[in-house]
Amino acid sequence: MPDNTPPVSQQGLPLGMAFRWVLAITLLLGSVLSAIIPPGKSPDEADHMVRAYLLSQGHVFLKTERCQGENALCHNGSTMSGGPVDQGLLEYFRLHDPYRRHKESMLDLQAGRVIPWRGQEVFFHAPGTGYYFPLVYLPQATALALGKTLGLTVENSYYLARAFAMTSGVLVLTLAFYIFWPQPAVLALLLVPMSLFQTASASIDFLCNALAILVIACFLRVATLRKEAPNSLFWMMALAVFLLGTARAHLASMVLLMAAAAWPTRRIQPWAAAATATVAILAWMALAIPATIDFRIPREMGTGQVVAYYLGAPLQLVRVLAHTVTDGNMLNSYVASFLGVFFDQPLTHRTYAWLAGLVALVILPCLASPRRLLQAALARSALVLTGVAGTLLAFLAMLFTWTPHPATLVQGVQGRYLLVPAMLLLLAVCSWEPAVHPWRQRLRWALLYVLGGVSMVVSVHRLLYAYYVQPAVALPSAVQAEPGALEPSPPLGPGSTIMLQLPPATSEPTAPATYGIGFLVGTYGQTLQGTAQLTLTDRAGQHHGVEVSLDDVTDNTYVFAKVPPGHYSQVELRIIQGQAAFSVWTFRPAAGNAARPTEAPVPMACTMTIREDRSMQLMPGCPGPK
């Protein structure tokens, strides 16, 4: 039977083709999800953005501050590790705190999009990122620095960071697929909902996954070329392995691939590259681990003491690991967070079953024959060893640094940590060459398209349902048509003020607090640009000021503003700046109306309040929002 293995010069995609395919697919999938996924929903995304901001300001290491007392943020006179962060960035992520579990609303969108860089910094704790070599945050740091320099809002800077993070991953994947052709097993794991979700976030996951695939591509290329492999491949591997090992500690095991790749060459430089990566990773850990102060998980023993304990009690270590990997609830959580959990929003059990089945269908046609397995026994053994070591390190890292001691189960391991080890183990049993028969090649790609399509559909459906579909809200019976007429207020421009009356139900003594206010505007067919100020007076007579963006407001729509929760008796609207005059719609009841028997009814501004119980109140006689 003829050997259909491509010559070594053709074992990667042409550079232009690789870039076009990776860019098109990533932009199509990632950009759609990026437009849907609310800010801050990726695990620890706020901390990652804080670390990126610190890098943009020249802070390589995290710092601590002196403090007094003993509490969650102060221990032995020191805070947890962190650094000085712009108040605007912190304000933005407080607004989008994922633990609020609120649906996204127009109030959140309008409040978030106007937050500027404040220019004032306060100390913020982000100890979970202190172990990572900061170079991996360079794309996000560049975006934040650029956004701040250009005067963009925090939100625009944040989405620029998402775009830069996605672009950096695209470039690394392009290089990987140029070095060695895309492996269907690897692509399948990149297309599960969890991977797509992280691709669209501003975290470091997509770049780390791309770097891991680059290391794998270099390894497979070297395994094919053997002694003819150029030294540049090994130094490229060394850089990627260093970035991986210092950003994802369990992936430091990929130095084993470098050693296995260097063995057949019988040259000094490949071994020098492997040694350099190993020493650099250990050196960074020796610097970062002692310098990072993290007491989020209260423990009486430090990381070093926990390591020493298990070194002296290896049987206890085996028992903890065995108990963890045989616990049914833990296994279910690993599968769910491997295939797809959007922060705290899992998919259905049926969806997980379908996704697992599709991944298996993609992999089955790629399995290598026994002859192929034996032809590259050393390389395949290295893949197995590295995958197993990476999995073990993921559990050990969380046991030593995160799990309360003494432990019965390892806590903190997420299924997405095992993505790269799974790739390595699958590649150990899959064929690395293109399919011999064209129909099999077409079958592989067809299955990948189906998997990608299904992943996108279930991801979009779950994201919309979890974060946007509101529960049914019934308007009060007072919102009914009544005799009268809508009238525009006098045109308002910069410096103009108008008093806004609130719906009568807002003033009820037992009414829930108001946290959102809207007012209906008429723009005379124009699209507004500008800023307004709401001054709210509560029942105690205290005043609260809220800035409102008028940008992109169109004719006959409500402008919403998020306000501090409270009970308000008076609201004044003042126009600060703007390019076009507009009016606030008012409702004047008909004279002689039984509800308002006065001869000259006073027009009431068309306002709307949103209360903390998520109910809405509308000024009687006014139209509701579109």
Briefly describe each language-model feature range.
Residues 1-31, 74, 272-277, 375, ...:
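Start-transfer (signal-anchor) and selected internal transmembrane alpha helices
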Residues 59-160:
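Interfacial juxtamembrane loops and adjacent helix segments
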Residues 182, 227-230, 266-272, 364-389:
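Membrane-interface helix-loop-helix junctions at transmembrane boundaries of multi-pass membrane enzymes
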Residues 471-626:
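C-terminal luminal/periplasmic domains and tails of membrane-associated envelope-modifying transferases
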